[in-house]
Amino acid sequence: SVDWNKYRFTLDDGCNEAVIKAFVELHRKNKIYRGYRLVNWDPSLKTAVSDLEVVRQEKDGLLWHIKYPIEDSEDHVIVATTRPETMFGDMAVAVNPNDDRYKNLIGKNIVLPFVGRKIPILADDYVDMEFGTGCLKITPGHDFNDYEIGKKYSLHEVNGQVETSDSASDFKPINIFNEDAWSNKNVPEPFSNLDRFKVRKAVLEKLKELNLLEKEEKHHISVPRGERSNI
């Protein structure tokens, strides 16, 4: 049986030395590198938090259906989202390649409302044809699943146009919030320098004014919160 009176701390001399040796050896073999990745950020504590410190709260919420205009066309696609305030960071709209509703749109561009950024319509098997409208907005800077899709296509913006690339180093997510979860300079007026929930309210009001909000419907959501701050 296990003797619980005996234990080792990962920063003990022996353990620490072994970890450093392993990392150095892996680095020499080009098996390990230091890079960027999306993290859980607590705007109250102003620190990244472990996945183990994130708790999910189930609640009733809303799903908003938003019209995204197609470039050089009178048509649009409708994107369903629970977080319309993040649309300023959108870098693509993805559809399932087997979805007959959108096959003719793959490769075309969306002109993102309020921003004017041109974002591509991509085909990806990740998209669930049965959820929402079957059109998924891709916001790599603010969603873990979107981050993986953005990395897969190396999405990056060049002069107001989001492009894809075969080079992983080209991938550059667009971050729209600062450490306090207020909108930053990547968000245009009158939506910048606002708390994220005030951004949501302002976005929805403007979408209604421009007749870009198709509808809203009740939707059960799972909200991640920091275990220590409940934010």
Predicted regions and their residues:
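NTP-handling and nucleic-acid-processing catalytic cores
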Residues: V2-D3, Y7-D180, N186
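Short, surface-exposed helix-loop/turn micro-motifs enriched in polar/charged residues
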Residues: N30-R34, D195, E214-K218
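Cys/His/Pro-rich metal-binding microdomains
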Residues: D42-P43, P224-E227
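A glycine-biased structural micro-motif
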Residues: N104-G107, N184-R200
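Phosphate/diphosphate-binding loops
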Residues: K198-V223
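Detector for conserved single-position "signature" residues within domains
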Residues: N230
